Amino acid sequence: MKTLVFHIFIFALVAFASASRNSAKKIGSQYDHYQTCLTELGVTEDDLFSIGEVTSGQHKTKHEDTKLHRNGCVMQCLLEKAGLMTGADFDEEKMRENYIEEKGLQPGDQRIDFLNSCMEQTKDIEDKCDKSLIFIGCVLMNEVSLPASNEEA
């Protein structure tokens, strides 16, 4: 019985540590052009929001507009360098293909609907930086809302 309780405790600890590590990561930090975009825009990693700040909505309430805009510009730079965005326009088909491949999704996965919804919600935003941050925030918040068994593989 002690062994079973110990294994359950270790499993819970590992799951919590993994979730905490992901929420502490900076948005966009997993992508190839991350450092390039930071350098081009004169932004430091300390200026960027963590995934946890975005998924909890804290990025909207605890930061001034200039920090929001800088974060959005970094996201736009990453999307543009990946060929997913030109100026303030998404390449929606390429965005879908890239997202499906990156996440290993199957047809009918709810995350594809979320992605489409986020693109629809942001389509009329003209400022490319604001549009990018709002879009990324929408996608991240939707992913967090899914049950654990439906998240990233």
Swiss-Prot record:
Protein name in UniProt: Pheromone-binding protein Gp-9
Assembly mode: Homodimer.
Similarity comment text for this entry: Belongs to the PBP/GOBP family.
Disulphide-bridged cysteine pairs: C37-C77, C73-C129, C118-C138
UniProt KW Chloroplast keyword: no
A biological process from GO: response to pheromone
Keywords for this protein: Behavior, Disulfide bond, Pheromone response, Pheromone-binding, Secreted, Signal, Transport
Gene3D superfamilies membership: Pheromone/general odorant binding protein domain
Short name of any one Pfam family annotated for the protein: PBP_GOBP
Function description: Colony queen number, a major feature of social organization, is associated with worker genotype for Gp-9. Colonies are headed by either a single reproductive queen (monogyne form) or multiple queens (polygyne form). Differences in worker Gp-9 genotypes between social forms may cause differences in workers' abilities to recognize queens and regulate their numbers.
GO molecular function: pheromone binding
Location in or out of the cell: Secreted
Main location: secreted
InterPro entries named in the record: PBP/GOBP, PBP_GOBP_sf, Pheromone-bd_protein_Gp-9
Signal peptide positions on this chain: 1-19
Classification via SUPFAM superfamilies: Insect pheromone/odorant-binding proteins
GO cellular component terms listed in the entry, alphabetical order: extracellular space
